[in-house]
């Protein structure tokens, strides 16, 4: 079981890192080209094999297909990113937990909690990401770190604790605000790529928590 769990954790980390990259910065021309490659389309097809993710992956692929016919695709998609994630909160979907859980204020209690968690795990935020620690990209990257770190554990008691910690992080730091974030993305993202990405992130995180809870019961 330990070997199977290590493979699963590597796949989970890969998906979390990928999701993090979508909200980290605007996609470049090279990034967009990769999204049209056979390798990435195969990766997305694999995700779609999960019934709970099928609809959201389908919406993301449809948006990527529309992107191929969008004039000035990179510039327009960068404008979508800016309008959604970098402007004022009134007509946007700011990707910070504090905005949704702490009176709409930036850099609130969730950011402080994330700073403490990152410090406790020795995780440093990438220097060129000048953002509060409760940014969605940072939280997703941290989950990837937790998944990979669990692969260093050899004792079942410690493994159970690591699985519980990941499930708790999802409950306490993501599911408290991600549904509202995804809803705002859907409301304000006219083209639909980032709203599809947000809904897919939510669906995957919900599925992952269910999986973690089942694994915890098996190892506890």
UniProtKB/Swiss-Prot annotation:
InterPro entries, A to Z: Chaperone_TorD, DMSO/NO3_reduct_chaperone, HscB_C_sf, TorD-like_sf, TorD/DmsD_chaperones
Subcellular location: Cytoplasm
Coarse class of the protein's main subcellular location: cytoplasm
Superkingdom of this protein's organism: Bacteria
Short name of any one Pfam family annotated for the protein: Nitrate_red_del
GO biological process: protein complex oligomerization; protein folding; protein maturation
GO CC terms, sorted: cytoplasm
Keywords, comma-separated and alphabetical: Chaperone, Cytoplasm
Family classification: Belongs to the TorD/DmsD family. TorD subfamily.
HAMAP family: TorD
Function: Involved in the biogenesis of TorA. Acts on TorA before the insertion of the molybdenum cofactor and, as a result, probably favors a conformation of the apoenzyme that is competent for acquiring the cofactor.
Protein name, per record: Chaperone protein TorD
Organism field: Vibrio cholerae serotype O1 (strain ATCC 39315 / El Tor Inaba N16961)
């Amino acid at each position: 079981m330990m070997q199977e769990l290590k493979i699963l954790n590597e796949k989970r980390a890969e998906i979390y890192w990928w999701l993090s990259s979508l909200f980290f910065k605007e996609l470049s021309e090279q990034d967009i080209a990769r999204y049209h490659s056979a390798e990435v389309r195969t990766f997305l097809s694999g995700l779609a094999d999960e019934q709970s993710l099928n609809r959201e992956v389908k919406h993301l692929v449809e948006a990527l297909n529309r992107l191929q016919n969008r004039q000035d695709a990179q510039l327009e998609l960068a404008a979508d990113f800016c309008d959604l994630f970098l402007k004022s909160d009134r007509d946007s979907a700011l990707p910070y937990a504090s905005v949704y859980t702490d009176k709409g204020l930036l850099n609130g209690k969730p950011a402080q909690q994330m700073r403490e968690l990152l410090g406790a795990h020795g995780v440093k935020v990438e220097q060129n990401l000048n953002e509060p620690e409760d940014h969605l990209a940072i939280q997703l990257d941290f989950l990837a770190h937790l998944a990979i770190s669990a692969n260093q554990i050899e004792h079942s008691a410690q493994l159970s604790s690591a699985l519980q910690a990941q499930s708790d992080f999802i409950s306490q730091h993501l599911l408290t605000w991600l549904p509202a974030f995804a809803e705002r993305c859907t409301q304000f993202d006219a083209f639909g790529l980032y709203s599809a990405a947000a809904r897919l992130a939510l669906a995957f995180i919900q599925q992952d928590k269910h999986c973690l809870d089942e694994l915890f019961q098996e190892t506890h």
